[in-house]
Amino acid sequence: MNKIFYVILDGLGDDPLDALDGRTPLEVARTPHLDRLAAQGRNGYVTTVGEGIAPESDIAVFAILGYDPHEHHTGRGPLESVGAGVEVNDGDLAYRVNFATVEREARSGGSQNGDQDGWAIVDRRVGRDLSSEEAHALAEEVQRKVALDKASFEFKATVGHRGILVLRSDEGPLSAEVENSDPDYGRQGSLGVALETFDNEVVTVTPVTGNEDDPAAERASDLTNEWLRKSFEVLDASEINAKRKGEGKLPGNFILTRDGGDHVPKLVSFKEKFGPEMGCFVEMPVELGIARLMGMGVVEAPTDLRPREQYERWAELALEAIEGYDGLYIHIKGPDVPAHDGDHDAKIHSIEDIDAHFFAPLLDSLDLRRALVAVTADHSTSCARKSHTDGPVPLLISGAGVSADGVDTYGETASRNGALGHLMGPQIMPNLVKLARG
């Protein structure tokens, strides 16, 4: 069996932009190594989860690793908790959370929260400059100072402004059938999706429609709202945030919750499902949690270097680690972050850095007669909309036994002319494994 390098470039896809003469950041970026792979292989385009679904990364990663998220997904919170090493038992409620900046506001109708006073969101990510050290210190302060009525919690900062929250009630199990307090994300059934339009204010958590009479959902919403109020009081008074404000920075004074889950999914291992023994290189807790639940090996790789240094080190480690596995799942966060900020120039530079500092050294040392390289994205992240979209993402598969299909560049438009055609996310892995087996 030929070795598999399955590389996911987070948020790579995008919309054509007027500022780029109708092209996307990927189409503008100088990517000679990705273009070479595309020219030597087969290309196609992928709807990762479904038409009309702007997926969050968790459900998209499920899909592109070959697992139907409609069947297996139980919420992003449990996945991130597993990735962060926090236990989630059945009946606990685990959330993915963001540190955010808010201001108190008085409301009088017209709000999604009615007349109840609440919080206007100033920045959902604290200006993206909350250090991991600050976030960990704030989380520890909340853990020490917040006391809940007949309940307990575990709050842990993970990377930057991100974290996880696990709530546990002494009065009975909690249900995940509750709304997000983060207005940027909604639900389609059990799946978390990015919303195009929303009020920029914290949402009071309530049971999802149809679950208003469920005691577990009512208990979960009440407990979440209690925790949000009490944690705000601690964070807003924190000396860490006072210091940030004195430095002209935004305070991380609120925690936005989303994508709760009340149990961890039970998955058939990747090896049992598809055959290959896979290892992974990932940056974020959600991908780490998914990989662990699928039984993948975790390659210890640095995530705290400057991007170019990290890409070069990852390429070096991938060439070493592949000797112990049939394939590697490599997830690179780079392009997603500037797209959320609406910065198409930074997204272009990120893509170019990945091409020059990850793919260049990888391909220089890789024998493509004995290996396959597949490159795609988990979702599109639109610079214009600053959010995930349901837009298809390009896919290339190049290497051993793969003939060229006449496509000579890697990009959203070119991929539509490729021999692979239009695939759904869960179709990628069976095709890739089949090609690897020759």
Task: Go through each PLM region and give its residues.
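Feature captures the catalytic ectodomains and active-site-proximal regions of enzymes
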Residues: M1-G438
